[in-house]
């Protein structure tokens, strides 16, 4: 029986058709359409990683055809109009050859035209990248000319571990890339999220894969990350004030932190929290790597046109939208527009401190609208909630200024737990100021306390230690410290929400 003619499409090349030919799972003469080669050449020149991998597979098919004594031929068609897959189907229809693919749509269309189809099935073996991970591995880093390394541990507490002692070659990394790209059609929840000149981002099940190649980088590089922790909101051991605010009041939420500190993990927990409260939750991600219940719709920013997500979210009316990885002006503009439209927003940004995260909004909006857009800022460090700010607006004389006619709208950034202002945001002249007021408040409070106590006990001294005001009374003036003074100090504590302690010479604080 003569060998059949096999015409692979791009998906078959990416899946590694040569492996099936070599182990005789599939047998036949190999036909490569000229239109496919032209498309791959153009894409390779544009820097697409998938095209280069596919061209390497064509070369491999030619090599094994010589060893296996099967024909390898470049074929062409008279009619090259239409899509590549359409041209391949037309050729198979006219020449009675078999199309080889991993694409279900290609298979269905070919079968409807009575074209023989071979749908490549995935191998049952464990993926190479899965062997690089254990239960503590956060990410694996592969770079041409460097030994493979893994980051093991948890956010904020990890170490870099060498996986092998031998440096990787470009061939080693291409083999890993080939396996990743060939698995996209078979591994659940997998897709190529972004493909640009020199870079490709793939979501492969739980793994997020970033592939970089020359000329964008100085060599082939693959970074594979995987979430090591999935937590419920209740597992963060948050203060009840924060939990109550998230449940009842917060609608303009900003989650900030350094890369790898657990921001997305917290955002994921928050999205599930609102879903359990029967809220309609949607996400905007790039890439889509959050693992959420099916009730949550996840949108990709990369596949949407400008304005498309804005229209979709306004018309679908979610209660909350999680915006993961806000980076550029377009991201912040969409967050602001949706929040002002009344949609609850949860934004995730990179920042080294919570005030830095707020600063990224300052030049994009009017100061008077800040609390309407941002009401709660959560700073994540080492996988835990490290700081929470609430934002409110008032009209007052900014702390540190004295003249009454300097009163103006001031946004107070308060520690949510202690309810004490730590920063004030206001316009001074033409510049928007972000002023730390904690020390300023301490100094002014201390001055008022000194004035009051020195009118009664002239030689008493006041210091601020460990969050308390310490009044030290000299031995010869102890008699002036009476019930009247104690009453005044208690009223002062209550009025200014501070703690005062009195110290006598050679005695412990009282």
From Swiss-Prot:
SMART domains registered for this protein in UniProt: AAA
Keyword Membrane set for record: no
GO molecular function: ATP binding; ATP hydrolysis activity; DNA binding
Signal peptide bounds: none
One Pfam short name: T2SSE
InterPro entries noted in UniProt: AAA+_ATPase (IPR003593), Nucleic_acid_metab_PIN/TRAM (IPR052041), P-loop_NTPase (IPR027417), T2SS/T4SS_dom (IPR001482)
Subunit organization: Homohexamer. Interacts with Holliday junction resolvase Hjc, interacts with helicase Hjm (Hel308).
Name this protein carries in UniProt: Holliday junction branch migration ATPase PINA
Organism, as annotated: Sulfolobus acidocaldarius (strain ATCC 33909 / DSM 639 / JCM 8929 / NBRC 15157 / NCIMB 11770)
Gene name in the database record: pina
């Amino acid at each position: 029986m003569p060998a059949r003619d096999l015409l692979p499409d791009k998906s078959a090349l990416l899946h590694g058709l040569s492996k099936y030919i070599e182990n005789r799972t599939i047998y036949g003469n190999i036909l490569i359409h000229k239109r496919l080669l032209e498309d791959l050449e153009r894409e390779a020149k544009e820097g697409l990683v998938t095209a280069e991998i596919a061209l390497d597979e064509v070369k491999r098919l030619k090599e094994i055809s010589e060893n296996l004594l099967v024909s390898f031929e470049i074929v062409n068609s008279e009619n090259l109009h239409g899509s590549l897959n359409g041209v391949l189907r037309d050729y198979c229809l006219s020449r009675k050859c078999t199309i080889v693919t991993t694409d279900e749509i290609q298979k269905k269309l070919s079968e409807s035209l009575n074209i023989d189809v071979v749908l490549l099935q995935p191998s049952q073996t464990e993926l190479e990248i899965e062997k690089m991970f254990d239960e503590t591995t956060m990410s694996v880093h592969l770079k041409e000319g460097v030994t493979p390394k893994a980051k093991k541990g948890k956010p904020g507490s990890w170490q870099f571990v060498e996986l092998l002692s031998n440096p990787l070659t470009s061939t080693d990394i291409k083999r890993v890339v080939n396996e990743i790209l060939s698995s996209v059609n078979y591994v659940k929840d997998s897709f190529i999220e972004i493909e640009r000149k020199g870079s490709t981002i793939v979501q492969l099940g739980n793994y997020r894969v970033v592939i970089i190649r020359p000329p964008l980088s100085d060599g082939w590089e693959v970074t594979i990350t995987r979430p090591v922790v999935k937590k419920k909101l209740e597992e963060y051991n948050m203060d009840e004030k924060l939990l109550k605010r998230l449940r009842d009041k917060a609608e303009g939420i900003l989650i900030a932190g350094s890369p790898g500190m657990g921001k997305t993990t917290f955002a994921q927990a928050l999205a599930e929290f609102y879903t359990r409260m029967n809220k309609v939750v949607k996400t905007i991600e790039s890439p889509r790597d959050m693992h959420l219940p099916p009730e949550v719709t996840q949108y990709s920013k990369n596949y949407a046109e400008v304005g498309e997500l804005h229209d979709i979210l306004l018309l679908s009316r979610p209660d909350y939208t999680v915006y993961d990885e806000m980076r550029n002006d377009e991201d912040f503009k969409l967050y602001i527009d949706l929040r002002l439209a009344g949609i609850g927003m949860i934004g995730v940004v990179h920042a080294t401190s919570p005030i830095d995260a707020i600063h990224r909004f300052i030049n994009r909006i009017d100061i008077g609208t800040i609390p309407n857009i941002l009401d709660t800022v959560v700073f994540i460090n080492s996988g835990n909630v490290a700081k929470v700010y609430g934002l409110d607006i008032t009209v007052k004389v900014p702390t540190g200024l004295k003249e009454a006619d300097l009163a103006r709208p001031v946004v107070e950034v308060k520690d949510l737990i202690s309810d004490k202002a730590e920063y004030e945001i206001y316009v001074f002249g033409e510049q928007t100021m972000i002023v730390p007021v904690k020390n300023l408040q301490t100094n002014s409070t201390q001055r008022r306390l000194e004035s009051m106590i020195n009118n009664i006990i002239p030689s008493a001294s006041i210091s601020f230690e460990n969050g308390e005001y310490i009044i030290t009374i000299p031995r010869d003036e102890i008699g002036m410290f009476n019930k009247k003074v104690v009453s005044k100090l208690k009223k002062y504590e209550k009025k200014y929400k501070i703690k005062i302690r009195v110290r006598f010479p050679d005695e412990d604080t009282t």
